[in-house]
């Protein structure tokens, strides 16, 4: 019966061996055991033996023998009994029955794989050289049983081999060893070799020294000594050189053969000298700036005020601030709680004052101020720009108002040419023209708003007709015309109502895809 931990295919080999033994036993039966000499008649029965023996025989008296006679009695008295010779090895008949070759196997057995033996059989070995013996040994190891099955304790069978003295050269010449360094030695620091000296000229003397191979190495007494290879070696006696003292005992060498370490005495100090405090030592250190001094100290020695000089430099180099523009700056404000007043107060006390804030816009002025200086009305310009953004035809009311305004302007020129600019008739005509222009602006804004609100995405085509007439919305015109003034004294123009509400679709033509014709017809119906 094959063992459960046997090799691969062991059960098949055992079964074949049993079949061969059974066939051999059937072909050659075992011979009958030889009969005893004389047959059964040579052994008397119990009764005959008792009668033949007669009565109880008298016991013979023993004979006294010496030790020497006792040892030689058996050899001299009777010849030694020769043990029957046992046949060694197999008989000629058994030798003839042994198989002369492998058993012939059927095709099924040949096709059937036996474990890992057939794995990689069709591959050809690659490479060559020193690695061939390894591959052959590896192939032969496949037939052998596993090491895990042979031994229960692997550490017991581990063999210890001491490391050779010249292991470094052996490794370089013969290639890598089969075992690792962890298997060869238990203490790695025992065979660790010292590194060569960084400055070989500062050793005990001149000469040559080799770390691991042959060469020359000088001893402490002079001459050459071989460390591990060939070379010359001189006794560590005194040297004949003039620089060495004759009869001097050489200094003891360390285990590694390096020069001895120098043990120097501490430096001697004068006991009468007083110790220097640490503060003075720190002061005595050279300054990285040399004899340079701070700028403030240099100016103070010259009798100059560095604060005034900085103020003059700032005035020359700083850009013009917002004081030149029409808008007031918080840094230059005269209010008591403003930052500018605080800065001026600090500067008056003599403390270092903060630098004035520079206007990032420089001399730039607001748009409204620039237009007023040019004699243009920025309100009309803004209304004109807003009106251009609305795509609608000019209404009849707007046309009539524009014609009346143009006629009044012509009359005003004639009156000014006849009566002069300061006449009352000219003032009345100019006031009437300004009123009609305001009325025209209100009408334009109202019609533009209807178009903008009519183009909202959620509104229909007839939403514009639902707005009340213009006469019932005087507050809308006030919201657009009477605008609050800014803090700097310049009027600013707020955003239109539709922009404040977030409706920007009317700025672009056809942005919401609404029909323009339907909106125009609905607005005309509302007029």
Swiss-Prot record:
GO terms for cellular component: nucleus. A motif (Nuclear localization signal) lies at residues 196-203. InterPro entries: EIF-4B_pln (IPR010433). Coiled coil: none annotated. Its main location: nucleus. Belongs to the eIF-4 subunit B family. Homodimer. Nonspherical monomer. mRNA-discriminating component of initiation complexes. This is Eukaryotic translation initiation factor 4B1. The gene is EIF4B.
């Amino acid at each position: 019966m094959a063992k459960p931990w046997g090799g691969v295919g062991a059960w098949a080999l055992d079964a074949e061996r049993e079949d061969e033994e059974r066939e051999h036993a059937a072909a050659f039966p075992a011979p009958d055991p030889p009969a005893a000499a004389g047959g059964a008649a040579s052994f008397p029965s119990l009764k005959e033996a008792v009668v033949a023996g007669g009565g109880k025989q008298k016991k013979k008296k023993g004979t006294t023998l010496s030790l020497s006679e006792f040892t030689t009695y058996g050899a001299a008295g009777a010849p030694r009994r020769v043990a029957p010779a046992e046949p060694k090895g197999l008989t000629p008949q058994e030798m003839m029955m042994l198989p002369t070759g492998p058993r012939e196997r059927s095709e099924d057995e040949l096709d059937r794989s036996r474990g890992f033996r057939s794995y990689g059989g069709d591959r050809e070995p690659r490479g060559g050289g020193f690695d061939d013996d390894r591959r052959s040994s590896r192939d032969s190891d496949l037939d052998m049983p596993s090491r895990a099955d042979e031994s229960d304790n692997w550490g017991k069978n581990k063999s210890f081999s001491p490391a050779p003295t010249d292991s470094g050269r052996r490794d370089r010449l013969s290639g890598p060893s089969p075992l690792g360094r962890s298997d060869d030695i238990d203490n790695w620091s025992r065979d660790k070799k010292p590194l060569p000296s960084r400055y070989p000229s500062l050793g005990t003397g001149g000469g040559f020294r080799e770390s691991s191979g042959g060469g020359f190495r000088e001893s402490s007494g002079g001459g050459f000594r071989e460390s591990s290879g060939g070379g010359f070696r001189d006794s560590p006696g005194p040297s004949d050189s003039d620089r060495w003292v004759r009869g001097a005992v050489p200094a003891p060498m360390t285990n590694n053969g390096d020069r001895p370490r120098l043990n120097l005495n501490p430096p001697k100090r004068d006991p009468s000298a007083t110790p220097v405090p640490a503060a003075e030592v720190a002061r005595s250190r050279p300054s990285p700036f040399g004899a340079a001094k701070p700028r403030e100290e240099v100016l103070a020695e010259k009798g100059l005020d560095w604060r005034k000089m900085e103020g003059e430099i700032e005035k020359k180099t700083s850009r013009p601030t917002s004081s030149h523009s029409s808008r007031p700056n918080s840094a230059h404000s005269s209010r008591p709680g403003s930052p500018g007043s605080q800065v001026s107060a600090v500067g008056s006390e003599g403390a270092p004052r903060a630098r004035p804030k520079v206007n990032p816009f420089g001399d730039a002025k607001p748009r409204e101020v620039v237009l007023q200086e040019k004699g243009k009305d920025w309100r009309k310009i803004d209304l004109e720009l807003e009106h251009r953004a609305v795509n609608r035809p000019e209404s009849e009311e707007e046309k009539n108002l524009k014609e009346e305004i143009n006629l009044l302007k012509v009359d005003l020129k004639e009156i000014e040419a006849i009566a002069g600019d300061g006449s009352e008739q000219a003032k009345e005509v100019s006031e009437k023209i300004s009123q009609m222009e305001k009325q025209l602006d209100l009408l334009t804004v109202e019609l533009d708003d209807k178009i903008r609100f009519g183009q909202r995405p959620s509104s229909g085509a007839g939403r514009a007709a639902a707005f009340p007439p213009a006469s019932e919305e005087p507050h809308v015109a006030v919201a657009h015309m009477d605008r609050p003034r800014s803090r700097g004294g310049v009027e600013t123009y707020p955003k239109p109502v539709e922009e404040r509400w977030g409706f920007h679709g009317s700025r672009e033509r056809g942005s919401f895809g609404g029909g323009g014709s339907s909106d125009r017809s609905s607005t005309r119906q509302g007029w």
